[in-house]
Amino acid sequence: MPKLKTNSSAKKRFKVTSTGKVMVTQSGKRHNMRKRNKRMLLVQKGYTLISKSKMRLMRSVMPYSF
């Protein structure tokens, strides 16, 4: 059986922690930032965890990360 390929766009966008959780950067921070207040910008800073319902999809997209 051949090796499974990892999706290239997924390996650039997602990060898997040592416990197996998948982290993704917050969306909505590319442009039109002046409309948002400072609190909203601080909330969107950093990473967030994906939901458990998306984990099955992530396992098929990045098979060797888990």
Swiss-Prot record:
GO cellular component: cytosolic large ribosomal subunit
GO molecular function, one term: structural constituent of ribosome
Alphabetical list of InterPro entries matching this protein: Ribosomal_bL35, Ribosomal_bL35-like, Ribosomal_bL35_CS, Ribosomal_bL35_sf
Keywords associated with the record: Ribonucleoprotein, Ribosomal protein
UniProt-listed GO biological process terms: translation
Family note: Belongs to the bacterial ribosomal protein bL35 family.
HAMAP family registered for this protein in UniProt: Ribosomal_bL35
Protein name (database record): Large ribosomal subunit protein bL35
